Amino acid sequence: MPIYNFSAGPAVLPQPVITQIQAELPSFRDSGMSILEISHRSDLFAQVLQDAEQDLRDLMAIPDNYHVLFFQGGGTLQFTAAPLNLAPHHRIGLLDSGHWAQRAADEAKRVGTKVTILGSSAANHFNQLPTVVQPIDQSLDYIHLTTNNTIEGTMMTRLPVTGQVPLVADMSSNFLGEPYQVSDFGLIFAGAQKNLGPAGLTIVIVRDDLIGQVANLPSMLDYQLFAAKDSMFNTPPVFAIYAAGLVLKWLKAQGGLSTMTARNHAKAALLYDFLDQSQLFTNPVKTSDRSTMNVPFVTGQADLDAAVIQGAREHGLLNLKGHRLVGGMRASLYNAMPLAGVQALVDYLAAFEAHHR
C-alpha cells in the first residue's frame, strides 16, 4: 500500500531526493565522510552552499541586487529579524490574514515596533484575504504580508499596491510552489520544512539597499553581517542546506517553477472540485482566495472528522488532522505530493461519504 504524507510541515520530500540522501549518507562525494560530519569550512560544503544559492537564484530569477541568506530559527525568528533590520523608524504596516500574521505582529511589538493593521479578515474568520485600506502611509518602514496561510487555507496571488513602501513576505508555506516576482518585494523569507527540505533551515532573500540601516544588532539576527559572511558567521545547518540543495536540483529537473505551479494547480483543483460537489465535506474558504498548498475541510461533526482521519490513516493517507486552532482536516499538497496521492485521497473521501450517507 502506498503511503502519502499530507503533513503541513515538516512535509513530504521528493522520493528521488530521499533515495539520494540514503545513498550518499555514509560517504559524501566519495570523501569517506558523511554529510553529517563534514566541516562547514571544507571545500565540499562550500560547493554545496554555492550550488544551493545559484540554483535558487536560477529558479526564482533573483536579481543581482538581492542577497540570498541561509538562516536557522525558522520563519518565526524572522518575525523579529525583519523589524530589527528593516524598520529604523519602528513603524510597519501589516495585513492580518490569520494566525501567522498575528504572530509576526506580536514579535514586532516585542522589539518596540509600532504595528498598523492595514486590513484584516478576522471578521470573516480568516476564510478570505483582507482588503487593504488605502491610501497607505508612505512613512511606514515596510508592510508585512503572508502569501499563504497554512492554517486558514488562503493564498495571496495579487499583491497590494504600496507605493514606495517595501513589501516583506512570509512565504514559508508556498515558497517555490507559486511564482512571484522577487523584485516586487524588499524581503522574502521562508522556513524550508514545507516545500524545500527538512526543518532547520530558513531562506532569506533581501534587497541590498534595505540592509545596514540599523547598527549594533544581535549578530545572529543581522542581515548585513550574514551577507558579509556569506551565511557563514557561525556554523550553518549543513545537512539541511545539503538536502535543500538536492530539492532545488530536483525542481530544476522537473522543469522549474512553471511546471511545478501547473502541477500544484491541477492537484488543488482535483481536491476542490470534489469538495465543492460533496454533500458531506465542505471547504470554508472564499473560492478566489483558496490556497493550492493547504486545503482545510470539515464534515461539521467532530466525531465524524475523527473517523475520517482514522480511516485515512488505515488507507495510507497520513497527517490529515487539521490544526488544533480550527480542527477538522487539512490536506497539504506541497510540490513533492504526487497527483496520485491527491487522487487516492479523493477516492477515499468519496468512499467514506458513500458509506455515511
Swiss-Prot record:
MF terms (GO), sorted A to Z: O-phospho-L-serine:2-oxoglutarate aminotransferase activity; pyridoxal phosphate binding
Metabolic or biological pathway: Amino-acid biosynthesis; L-serine biosynthesis; L-serine from 3-phospho-D-glycerate: step 2/3
Transferase listed as a keyword: yes
Keyword Amino-acid biosynthesis part of the UniProt annotation: yes
Cofactor section: pyridoxal 5'-phosphate
Compartment(s) where it occurs, according to its Swiss-Prot or TrEMBL record: Cytoplasm
E.C. numbers: 2.6.1.52
GO biological process, one term: L-serine biosynthetic process
The entry's keywords: Amino-acid biosynthesis, Aminotransferase, Cytoplasm, Pyridoxal phosphate, Pyridoxine biosynthesis, Serine biosynthesis, Transferase
Major subcellular location class: cytoplasm
Positions that bind pyridoxal 5'-phosphate: 75-76, 100, 150, 170, 193, 234-235
Free-text function comment from the UniProt entry: Catalyzes the reversible conversion of 3-phosphohydroxypyruvate to phosphoserine and of 3-hydroxy-2-oxo-4-phosphonooxybutanoate to phosphohydroxythreonine.
Name of the molecule in the record: Phosphoserine aminotransferase
Organism: Lactiplantibacillus plantarum (strain ATCC BAA-793 / NCIMB 8826 / WCFS1)
Lineage start: Bacteria, Bacillati, Bacillota, Bacilli, Lactobacillales
